[in-house]
Regions:
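Feature primarily recognizes SF3-like P-loop helicase cores of small DNA viruses
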Residues: 1-59, 63-218
Length: 218
């Protein structure tokens, strides 16, 4: 337990302030951000979820995305869009990826093929083994997915199961140019070890709740 003499809570004032500001002071949403980071880092795909940072420009989405990207080794991060994930075969660079990060989803309606693919890729079931790379090797099912958009999600065909896979992190607190901290990413990276440690604590609590993210319906 954090706060004991044996395991003090990591000190992460920059992250704490950033998450609080990005969430507009909504503590439930702050908790969800911590849970998201913890789950993305943990070697666990049981939640069957992917993550969406959603809201206007200049709200901190890209800074958070770049910070999360920097947690992982470069060779374990890919940048395939939803439409690219819907292609017949996964590209070779996806092999070994632990995080797929696409930070600028368009306002176009998403094709049903891409919807089905992301459901399979986050499904943690045997059917994902039918997803192939171009050299016919099977997908190993270890990648997590983080997307960001300034727009509402639009589908060519409604799909309840797709929306049930999304853990949305809304960003609505627009920061003006004069108040923007251009060194924020560097400051967050200086706290990286503490942020990851704290996020993994939230992840352990998430597991105890059977992967019910803060603020989600049961």
């Amino acid at each position: 337990t954090y706060g004991s003499a044996y395991e003090p809570a990591p000190v992460t004032p920059v992250a704490d302030n950033f998450f609080y500001s990005a969430a507009g002071g909504n503590q439930s949403l702050v908790t969800r951000i911590w849970e998201m980071i913890g789950y993305l880092v943990a070697p666990d795909i049981m939640a069957k979820k992917f993550f969406l940072l959603q809201g206007p420009s200049n709200t901190g989405k890209s800074v958070l995305g770049r910070f999360i990207q920097n947690i992982f080794p470069k060779g374990q991060v890919t940048g395939l869009s939803l439409s690219q994930l819907g292609d017949a075969n996964l590209p070779a660079e996806f092999m070994g990826s632990r995080l797929n990060l696409s930070m600028d989803l368009s306002n176009n309606k998403t094709d049903p093929k891409a919807i089905e693919r992301i459901k399979l890729l986050t499904g943690n079931d045997l059917i994902s083994q039918n997803i192939k790379y171009k050299d016919n090797r099977s997908y190993n099912g270890q990648c997590k997915f983080l997307f960001s958009t300034n727009h509402p999600i639009r589908l060519k065909q409604w799909d309840d199961a797709f929306f049930q896979r999304i853990v949305c992190i809304p960003f609505y607190n627009v920061i003006s140019q004069e108040h923007k901290d251009t060194k924020l990413l560097d400051k967050l990276l200086s706290e990286k070890d503490g942020i990851v440690s704290k996020a993994l604590f939230y992840y352990q609590e998430l597991k105890k709740r059977n992967y019910l993210f803060e603020g989600q319906d049961k």
